[in-house]
Amino acid sequence: MGKLFGTDGVRGVANQGLPPELAFRLGRAGAAVLAGKGDRVRVVVGRDTRISGDMLEAALVAGICSVGGQVLKVGIIPTPAVAWLTRDLGADAGVVISASHNPVADNGIKFFSASGYKLPDPVEEEIERLVLAPEDNLPRPVGVDLGRVKEVTEAPERYIAHVCSTAGRGLAGMQVVLDCANGAACRVAPAIFQRLGAEVSLLHNVPDGTNINVRCGSTHPESLQAEVVARGAAVGLAFDGDADRVIAVDEKGQVVDGDVIMTILALYRQEQGGLPGGQVVVTVMSNYGLHQALTAAGLRVQQTRVGDRYVLEEMLKSGAVLGGEQSGHIILLEHNTTGDGLITGVQLLQVMAATGRPLSELAAAMPRLPQILVNVRVGDKDAAMASPALQAAVAAAREQLAGRGRVLVRPSGTEPIIRLMVEGPDREELENIMAGLQRVASGL
């Protein structure tokens, strides 16, 4: 990765690591690179509900217009909607201003190509080179050659209609609780599930700019679990701040994570005549129970490094149409080019409606090995990963679990965090191993 672009675009604390000056330069450089030698570049721009979104959007849009680019503003809208709208509106690129599930102080800028995919590394590197250049030699048109901004007010409705079009049946009578994380799903999620006929109840659907992801959404499903049980609902869906991921809750209040959702979707498609490509792409963090359930059904499981960009790369290479992460970031390539929590949620409820089976029963198809995940905040994640003390602790843990489980340690792609994972047959043993790893990592 370069100095600016990480695994998920450019991220930082808004107004510090990601100031409006940088957003302006990214707008200029991005528009110039993506325009190539063609006519005026047309760029879709959307954002989530963060308080810093107005500031960064204004700077980014100014940068695009300053090189003659045309901006199609779609407002507060999910990240996957920006990817889809970029293609639907025939734009040359899309940009979303969001830090997904990160805290409110953070924000990010992520580009999509005309085809709705994340930009290839060489294109990001060229944008970064221009942004960091000592002199700005990009065009500065004047008069009628300046860019314009168009508000695309129908954008949310276009995306809502697209998501609903992926459903083969209605959801009449199904009680659904939606946790919108006070984020980008707040407008579109209720409309989608109500249009499909579900009886919808809402949690965390009143964004104020500062409450996005705060004790809610896919990273904090506790209140959704309680609400599903209290209402006697069939299912709950928790999105993150930009709705590119979703976690479900069954009728008993139990969390159904991305591994289980992928298993349910894959097994249903296999039963209905076969999953296109015959395989599912997951990361090394996926529970081994997923591998057991899918291989028993005759499906292949491909593993990648952690990160949706690596999942997508393998999907495109292998012809898979389903892939994703335990976190609920699931890519359904038949419907969108990136992880889409709304489409994933609709497809999960389609399986429930088609089979007439409760979610808890569908989820039981995946046996689950005990797995413990812990995030440890560190000063320098690269230095921490290279620490002899941590490496020795990991080696000892792996030796203890040899042949019976797994130990994974990796740096976050977007935060100063080391992620620890242990998996095996005995939870008490795993807790002891994790306590030792966490003690070492916390001291780095």
Swiss-Prot record:
It catalyses: alpha-D-glucosamine 1-phosphate = D-glucosamine 6-phosphate. GO terms for molecular function: magnesium ion binding; phosphoglucosamine mutase activity; phosphomannomutase activity. One of its GO terms (cellular component) is cytosol. The modification Phosphoserine is found at residue 100. CDD domains: GlmM. Activated by phosphorylation. Keywords: Isomerase, Magnesium, Metal-binding, Phosphoprotein. Disulfide bonds: none annotated. Binds 1 Mg(2+) ion per subunit. Signal peptide: none annotated. InterPro entries: A-D-PHexomutase_a/b/a-I, A-D-PHexomutase_a/b/a-I/II/III, A-D-PHexomutase_a/b/a-II, A-D-PHexomutase_a/b/a-III, A-D-PHexomutase_C, A-D-PHexomutase_C_sf, A-D-PHexomutase_CS, Alpha-D-phosphohexomutase_SF. This is Phosphoglucosamine mutase. Pfam families: PGM_PMM_I, PGM_PMM_II, PGM_PMM_III, PGM_PMM_IV. Its cofactor is Mg(2+). Catalyzes the conversion of glucosamine-6-phosphate to glucosamine-1-phosphate. It comes from Moorella thermoacetica (strain ATCC 39073 / JCM 9320). The active site is at 100 (phosphoserine intermediate). Belongs to the phosphohexose mutase family. Mg(2+) binds at residues 100, 240, 242, 244. It is an enzyme of class 5 (isomerase). Its EC number is 5.4.2.10. GO terms for biological process: carbohydrate metabolic process; peptidoglycan biosynthetic process; UDP-N-acetylglucosamine biosynthetic process.
